[in-house]
Design a protein with these regions (language model features):
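Short, conserved catalytic/metal-binding motifs centered on acidic residues
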Residues: 29-39, 74, 115-124, 139-142, ...
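Short acidic, glycine/serine/threonine-rich loops at helix termini
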Residues: 43-48, 75-81, 91-92, 126-132, ...
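Electropositive, glycine- and tryptophan-enriched low-complexity nucleic-acid-binding patches
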Residues: 52-109
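Domain-level cores of phosphate- or acyl-group-handling catalytic modules
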Residues: 92-148
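An anionic, glycine-rich sequence signature occurring as long contiguous blocks
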Residues: 138-251, 355-370, 378
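Short amphipathic alpha-helical "interface-anchor" segments enriched in bulky aromatics
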Residues: 229, 233-283, 310
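A short, flexible helix-boundary coil/loop motif
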Residues: 280-378
Length: 378
């Protein structure tokens, strides 16, 4: 099924022309592959289900996605079903999923810098980054800061900090970025890797953490991109959050539950869910380019494009009814005779009482003792 999806994907991309995700890709405008894991709850004991790190019970699949950018959605490149207790930063799993995603792209085993792989901190291991470097692709991977981060932060000169940007390119208030590659011991990491730190004031009401320094929340990521401003590289890395939207949409197409008992059967279900997600993405890519529906999620597409816009059912015997009136099974049914009374046999109701009329007292409910009430009593 995955091989068939790859063959159809390359055919769809060739039909899309200039709207294809691989149209005009280069080191400055690469094909983006996002890798992230998610949790899927299992409400009964199933093969492979296990406790998760969040206290639940189920599976921990690792996924990869082709990002269509701000003007589109995305496609499922690979899904690897794992037990719920699988490690979030397992390098072997990340390497397998990335290899399958590169095979789906059809650009060769070493596509070069025209492919960008983005991963959160779970992919920030020496094995995973080394694999990406050997494949000669661009990468932007979350980097775990060491324990002596406060000492590193104190060595950064003020002139090294540059304002961070929002997704729209405007400066972000209270956020800055700086490169700290020369301040770290990167022995064992691939050559040419850069580490960029981001500092930002926590939002009002947010709780401070023990690793916050001088009131700033510090994060970092690693990349092998040598050109571009630091703020632009940091925005490019944070746009990896679109992968969360793709995972949420995939859960609407079948990834959100695993009703089957066997692990192999649930792996097939993952492929079916990926195919359903890709069919919607391909339909939007080929038929809805330039329309707001190009970015709609599956539930919204289903309601507005498939269900809400279907043609109405023709009336029996109407001009738009393709069936002849005498061929309809209800044509020769004798009409039901009307009931002699509109209330279906009930006696007619008494006319409504006149205004100010009081019904006579019920003898069964009158008092057996005491004086009678006056006639003009309310």
């Amino acid at each position: 099924m995955e091989a068939a999806r790859g063959e159809v994907r390359r055919r769809v991309w060739s039909l899309a022309g200039e709207n294809s995700p691989t149209a005009g890709i280069s080191a400055e405008s690469p094909l983006v592959i996002d890798v992230d894991a998610t949790l899927v709850e299992a409400h009964s004991a199933k093969e492979g289900a296990a406790p998760t790190f969040k206290g639940g019970f189920g599976y921990h699949p690792l996924t990869a996605w082709f990002d269509h950018g701000a003007d589109g959605a995305g496609e499922c490149a690979a899904i690897m079903l794992r037990p719920g207790n699988a490690g979030a930063n397992t390098a072997a799993d990340h390497i397998e999923v990335i290899s399958r995603a590169l095979a789906q792209a059809g650009l060769g085993s070493r596509p070069g810098r025209k492919v960008l792989v983005r991963i959160d901190g779970a992919g920030g291991t020496k094995e995973t980054v080394g694999f990406l470097a050997r494949r000669r692709v661009s990468y932007s991977v979350g980097f775990k800061l060491p324990g002596h981060t406060p000492d590193i932060y104190s060595k950064i000169p003020k002139s090294a900090w540059a304002p961070a940007y929002n997704a729209d390119g405007d400066p972000r208030e209270g956020a800055d970025v700086a490169e700290i590659t020369d301040l770290l011991d990167l022995s064992g990491w691939p050559e040419g890797m850069r580490v960029i730190m981001r500092r930002e004031r926590p939002h009002p009401g947010a709780r401070l953490r023990f690793d916050d320094v001088d009131g700033y929340r510090l994060t970092a990521f690693a990349t092998n991109t040598r050109t571009g401003q630091l703020a632009d590289l940091e925005v490019r890395h944070r746009l990896r959050a679109r992968c969360e939207d793709r995972i949420r949409c995939a859960k609407d197409t079948g990834l959100g539950s695993f009703p089957l008992q066997g692990l192999a059967a649930n792996r097939i279900r993952c492929q079916v869910a990926a195919l359903a997600h890709d069919l919607l993405a391909w339909s939007q890519l080929l038929a809805l380019t330039g329309h707001p529906a190009r970015k709609w999620e599956p539930t919204w597409v289903t309601f507005n494009y498939f269900w809400h816009r279907r043609p109405p059912r023709p009336q029996v015997g109407a001009q738009d009814d393709p069936r002849p009136a005498d061929a309809h099974p209800r044509h020769h049914r004798p009409p039901r005779p009307p009931h002699p009374h509109p209330l279906q046999g009930r006696p007619p109701l008494d006319p409504p009482p006149a205004p100010g009329h009081r019904p006579p007292p019920d003898p069964a409910r009158t008092l057996t003792s005491g004086p009678p009430p006056p006639e003009n009593a309310p």
